[in-house]
Amino acid sequence: MRELVLGGQKSGKSRWAEARAARWLQAEPRHRAVLLATAQARDAEMRARIERHRRERAERVPGLETLELGEDDVPSMLLRQSSPQALVVVDCLTLWLTQLWWPAEARHATAQPTPSLTDVQARVDALLHALQQVGGPVVLVSNEIGLGVIPMGVQVRAFVDALGALNQRVAAVCERVTLMVAGCPCVVKGDV
């Protein structure tokens, strides 16, 4: 079972994915759950946020193993960690795509970088290929950012379009898609 969990900021999407992992761990003693965390600590605020998430996750879901990844690691780690006894949570695709779109070295440049769309597309294709090859359940978290106003900048508009396209492609291979609204799950595709 592959599930895509979408929602806005603070909509409850990560909590929903963590609850899926907790239920998985409780269902069978041999089960394991792994969270592939895509956030990277690029500044003090993000470091504090990541540390807070680590602490809160450890309290909410004892036994959930967290692996912090770089932008290149998601497809390969997804395949490496996936098995019939292991549920893998990817949190989140939005940050993963952000890091592909604006690599670390480009974020510190004075000029606005232009991402290599070919490189980004190749990595997205690798993720989709990995999702089709997984050997166990996967829950992917992503932001739904296309419901707001149209952004002013050309690069931001292109990113919103790219994330929307990524979400559509991931949803197409998932058996379940859940939209989180104010902490409430709305099943968009699949069974409740």
What role is predicted for each listed range?
Residues 17, 53, 89, 143, ...:
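Residue-level signal for inorganic ion chemistry
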Residues 2-82:
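Conserved P-loop
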Residues 63, 84-87, 134-139:
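Loop/turn-to-beta-strand initiation segments
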Residues 31-34, 86, 137, 176:
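Residues at the starts of beta-strands that form the adenosine-phosphate
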